[in-house]
Structures are given as structure tokens and as C-alpha cells.
Curated annotation (Swiss-Prot):
Gene from which the chain derives: BLS1
Any GO CC annotation of this UniProt entry: endosome
More details: Present with 468 molecules/cell in log phase SD medium.
KW Phosphoprotein (keyword) present: yes
Primary localization class, coarse: other
Record protein name field: Biogenesis of lysosome-related organelles complex 1 subunit BLS1
Transmembrane segments: none
Organism expressing this protein natively: Saccharomyces cerevisiae (strain ATCC 204508 / S288c) (Baker's yeast)
Alphabetical UniProt keywords: Endosome, Phosphoprotein, Transport
Length: 122
């Protein structure tokens, strides 16, 4: 009897889920066994470690990161803000004064041009 490709594929499809289900069943049996096996002890230790990591170490890490972030970023920015805030109002005043000086210079230039024009016309 010759096997065709489609027959082989069908056999694999039919047989593989059964093996997968069997492996899952055996793994559950080992892990959930009422008898303390090495696998169940290891699983229990992993679960305990995961709980410790999430409840203790992760909180400490987040707190450490927050403190580090505050010291490296937030505190220097607050310091610069407090240091240079008084100058911000001063720079606005300088800008207004520069605009007034520029306007006065244009008025003086126009006045000078009008005086020169009147002199030349006489």
C-alpha cells in the first residue's frame, strides 16, 4: 500500500493534537500531583519568587527609579526655574525698551531726512 502526501498530512493532523493533549494532561498531572514531586516543588518556588518579585522588589525598583528621575531631571529643572524666573520679566522689559529705542531712532531718522529735504529745497 502506497501512502500519498495527503494521507500523511491527514495522519499528522489527526495524531498530533492527541499527543499534545496527552502531554498537557501529563504535565498537569505532574504539577498538580498531591504528592510533592521535584517539579511541583520547583513550580511552588517559582510562584513564591514571582510573588516576592512583584510585591517587594518591583516596588523598591520603582521607588528607586522615581528618586533617581527626580534627582537627575526634576530637581535641576526646578532649580533653573527658580534661578532664572526673575530674569524673565526683565527680558520682557528689555524687549519693550528695545522696541521703543528702535521707534525713536526711526523718528529721528525721518526727522533728519525731512530737515535735509527742506534745506535742499530752499
Amino acid at each position: 500500500m502506497f501512502l500519498t502526501f495527503s494521507m500523511c498530512v491527514n495522519w499528522i493532523i489527526v495524531k498530533m493534537p492527541n499527543r499534545s493533549e496527552e502531554l498537557d494532561r501529563l504535565l498537569d498531572k505532574i504539577i498538580n500531583s498531591p504528592h510533592r514531586t521535584e517539579a511541583s516543588k520547583t513550580l511552588q518556588e517559582i510562584e513564591n519568587n514571582q510573588s516576592y518579585i512583584l510585591n517587594v522588589q518591583l516596588k523598591k525598583l520603582l521607588r528607586l527609579h522615581d528618586d533617581s528621575f527626580k534627582n537627575k531631571c526634576v530637581s535641576p529643572i526646578n532649580y533653573m526655574l527658580e534661578k532664572y524666573t526673575p530674569y524673565m520679566g526683565h527680558t520682557e522689559a528689555l524687549q519693550k525698551e528695545a522696541e521703543l529705542v528702535d521707534r525713536d531712532l526711526r523718528i529721528l531718522e525721518m526727522t533728519y531726512q525731512l530737515i535735509e529735504k527742506n534745506r535742499n529745497s530752499k
